[in-house]
């Protein structure tokens, strides 16, 4: 999406907006498609003057994409191995456009797009900031708890456990890889992702790192 009245010599910031599980770019970037989760947020960003790009990602098709994850794992890969490569190409292409300010390309993902907001900008420094919406979590509890209704053990999303992730990176550690770039968590008290206590516990570790570096305002 391009905002109106971009001057020929002007370079605008870009927001890459990422849909969630079983989603389509139209869910967030179609002016005629109002959904309760997305509220056309990509369109609203374009109205504010940002260039917006909403790519399609592979986490769609129920077990079809989950089989892709299982085929990738023995090769020491995951679904995000492919998604990260997609974003490398996206960043290269966006940076080549005359109307784009390549130093101000941001990432904003919701739900499964929020998972992408944690993992991809941590690896690709070309993203100047990241917004994780409706996903930030205490990831070990989210995957391993047999007692809480928020746990993936109680859903059909069997691709969620990622080898050795709990032993290496929880969400706070991923955010530290995004630091010192700005980072934001967006969530609702009743969004069904996790209880407030889980998110507050993990986010406190994220915020402490920014405070220690004198970056609390980011």
Model-derived regions: residue spans:
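Short beta-strand-to-loop junctions in surface cap/lid or active-site-entrance loops
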Residues: 1-11
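Alpha/beta-hydrolase fold nucleophile elbow
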Residues: 99-111
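Conserved hydrolase catalytic core segment
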Residues: 122-128
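Cap/lid segment of the alpha/beta-hydrolase catalytic domain
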Residues: 10-96, 142-146
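Glycine-rich nucleophile elbow surrounding the catalytic serine of serine-hydrolase chemistry
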Residues: 109-121
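Mobile cap/lid helix-loop segments that gate and shape the active-site cleft of serine hydrolases
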Residues: 129-174, 180, 193-203, 209-216
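Alpha/beta-hydrolase-fold catalytic nucleophile elbow
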Residues: 56, 108, 133-134, 186
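Short beta-strand/loop motif that positions the catalytic acidic residue
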Residues: 178, 185-187
């Amino acid at each position: 999406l391009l905002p109106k009245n971009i001057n020929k010599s002007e370079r605008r910031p870009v927001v890459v907006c990422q849909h969630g599980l079983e989603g389509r770019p139209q869910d967030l970037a179609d002016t005629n498609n109002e959904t309760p989760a997305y509220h056309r947020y990509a369109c609203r960003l374009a109205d504010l003057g940002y260039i917006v790009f909403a790519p399609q990602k592979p986490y769609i098709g129920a077990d079809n994409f989950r089989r892709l994850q299982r085929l990738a794992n023995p090769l020491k890969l995951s679904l995000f191995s492919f998604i990260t490569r997609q974003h490398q190409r996206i960043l290269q292409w966006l940076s080549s456009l005359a109307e784009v300010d390549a130093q101000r390309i941001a990432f904003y993902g919701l739900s499964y797009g929020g998972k992408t907001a944690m993992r991809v900008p941590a690896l690709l420094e070309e993203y100047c900031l990241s917004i994780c919406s409706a996903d930030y979590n205490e990831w070990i509890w989210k995957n391993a708890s047999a007692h809480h209704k928020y746990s993936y053990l109680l859903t059909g999303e069997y691709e969620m456990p990622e080898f050795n992730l709990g032993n290496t990176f929880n969400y706070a550690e991923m955010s530290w890889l995004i630091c010192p770039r700005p980072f934001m968590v967006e969530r609702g008290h009743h969004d069904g992702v996790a209880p407030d206590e889980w998110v507050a516990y993990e986010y406190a570790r994220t915020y402490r790192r920014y405070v220690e570096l004198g970056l609390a305002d980011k």
